[in-house]
From Swiss-Prot:
Name by which UniProt lists this protein: L-lactate dehydrogenase 2
Catalytic activity entry: (S)-lactate + NAD(+) = pyruvate + NADH + H(+)
E.C. number(s) listed in UniProt: 1.1.1.27
Pfam families named in the record: Ldh_1_C (PF02866), Ldh_1_N (PF00056)
UniProt cross-references to PANTHER family, sorted A to Z: L-2-HYDROXYCARBOXYLATE DEHYDROGENASE (NAD(P)(+)) (PTHR43128), L-LACTATE DEHYDROGENASE (PTHR43128:SF16)
Residues annotated as the enzyme's active site: H177 (proton acceptor)
Gene designation: ldh2
InterPro entries: L-lactate/malate_DH, L-lactate_DH, L-lactate_DH_AS, Lactate/malate_DH_C, Lactate/malate_DH_N, Lactate_DH/Glyco_Ohase_4_C, NAD(P)-bd_dom_sf
Disulfide bonds listed in the record: none
Length: 311
């Protein structure tokens, strides 16, 4: 079998957390680290190699330039422009990050990259769309982590309220990985029952679904303000998405996909349920949304498109 190779571009908090999660799960044969800070990335390589030695099996952990990528299966982009400086806005951050991505992706394509791009860099949906445009790859081979972490948080919150396993819950968040995301309660269930029908049966009362959705949305911001970054959750998200791609699981995850008519939209990437295969996005699942959800989706589309137009 061909060795599975993942390249992580950006060895900061998110990239390193993802690398450590890959080491712990060890389903790839080579993990490749890329960073402009050569001393830091070499230190991370050695540290991760030590961690990998405790795990069964063999994994090569190497350092390369981003352009040395012709044999890479999945390239994970986690680069950022760094924290905002005083007086800078989110738009300034977007433009700085966009410039970095604009320099990396063309070099990778010149280097013969023919794999799958997975984008974790924020703002995820905008950068995912930009990478797709820069790469010239088919849209199914460029996706972002999107709202899969937000969806997982939503399920965790429900599981904690109901004292059940999160894996028993089918609940989704769609839209932007940001303020305009929204839960799709019309397609959410627990053991085949609507969420609050199950809650009333078990707890004797309905859950405050609005509050739970807001908490799922805001948790990332809370973590950022409490510790200065988010890393472990998004690191785990990256690894899970890669695992489903390599295994060809055919499982639907809410990742950021480039739309071409789905949900009546095009010209952007946005978080929607997508079936993953070894070629990336096999199918985008178009859910029949209720009127309130349609409005929320349209709002999220408008937010993302406005940001795309600004770069």
């Amino acid at each position: 079998m061909k060795p599975r190779k993942v390249m992580i571009i950006g060895a900061g908090n998110v990239g390193t957390a993802a690398a450590h999660a890959f080491v712990n799960q060890k389903f790839v044969e080579e993990l490749i680290l890329v960073d402009l800070n050569k001393e830091r990335v070499e230190g991370n390589r050695k540290d991760l190699a030590d961690a990998a030695a405790f795990m069964p099996g063999k994994m090569d952990i190497t350092v390369r330039d981003a352009s040395d990528c012709a044999d890479v299966d999945i390239a994970v982009i986690t680069v950022t422009a760094g924290p905002l400086k005083e007086g800078q806005t989110r738009l300034d951050e977007l433009r700085s990050t966009s410039r970095i991505v604009s320099s990396i992706v063309p070099e990778m394509m010149k280097g013969g990259f023919n794999g799958i791009f997975l984008i974790a860099t924020n703002p995820c949906d905008i950068i995912t769309y930009q990478v797709w445009k820069l790469s010239g790859l088919p849209r199914e081979r460029v996706l972002g982590t999107g709202v899969w972490l937000d969806t997982t948080r939503l399920r965790r919150l429900l599981a904690e309220k109901l004292d059940i396993a999160a894996q028993s819950i089918d609940a989704f968040i769609l839209g932007e990985h940001g303020d305009s995301q929204f839960p799709v309660w019309s397609h959410s269930s627990i053991y085949g029952k609507p969420v609050n029908e199950y809650s009333v049966e078990k707890l004797g009362e309905a859950l405050d679904l609005k509050q739970i959705g807001e908490t799922a949305r805001d948790t990332g911001f809370e973590i950022y303000h409490q510790k200065g970054c988010t890393e472990y959750g998004i690191g785990g998200t990256i690894v899970e998405i890669c695992r489903h791609i390599f295994s060809g699981s055919q499982r639907a995850l809410t990742v950021s996909c480039v739309l071409d008519g789905e949900y009546g939209e095009s010209g952007l990437a946005i978080g929607v349920p997508a079936v993953l295969s070894q070629n990336g996005v096999k199918e985008i699942i178009s859910l029949k949304l209720d009127e309130k959800e349609k409005e929320a989706f349209a709002n999220s589309v408008a937010v993302i498109k406005k940001s795309i137009q600004s770069i």
